[in-house]
Amino acid sequence: RSQWIIGGDGASYDIGYGGLDHVIASGKDVNILVLDTEVYSNTGGQSSKSTPVGAIAKFAAAGKRVRKKDLGMIATTYGYVYVAQIAMGADQAQCLKAIREAEAYPGPSLIIAYAPCINHGLKKGMGKAQEEQENAVKCGYWHLWRYNPALEAEGKNPFSLDSKEPNWEGFKDFLKGEV
């Protein structure tokens, strides 16, 4: 029977990280989807361990001074956790592939989904959140990748970078698209 746990970045990167780590370390066949808004969205957009360095948020008015926790890479260090980073608006096929692979994987899986929210202050509005995800990937802000430990048993590289080479010229425009 399929088991999915869905939560936000605040619970996954910060206040609930111990629980998340415990579930992943258990080796049980459970799937976890983290909606990563990069701030505490439900309480007003405060900075968190998911907030990238330099970002301006509540409690980080001068810009966050420390780097974002790399939750996905931390999970890969176990060696037996399926991990993927997705952005549905950027690549729906990659998103579905990651979800299907996580579902089929006989152990813990963690999918981290880029999820723009109202606290990003999208100048084009939240109706363009899918477009924002696409721009985030195209400019190199957010990377699409998958780590499937089952591939090692087949003698294959378990890591797959699904993003194309970034267009760095679009990075500045991407950042300007948010308040």
Q: What do the PLM-derived regions correspond to, one by one?
A:
Residues 32-39, 56-65, 166-169:
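Phosphate-binding glycine-rich loops and adjacent basic patches that engage nucleotide phosphates
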Residues 47-69, 127-147:
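Acidic, Ser/Thr-rich peripheral helices and adjacent loops at domain boundaries
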Residues 1-46, 82-83, 89-106:
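Thiamine diphosphate
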Residues 51-104:
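Conserved thiamine diphosphate
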Residues 95-179:
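Glycine/aspartate-rich loop-and-adjacent alpha/beta segment that forms the canonical ThDP
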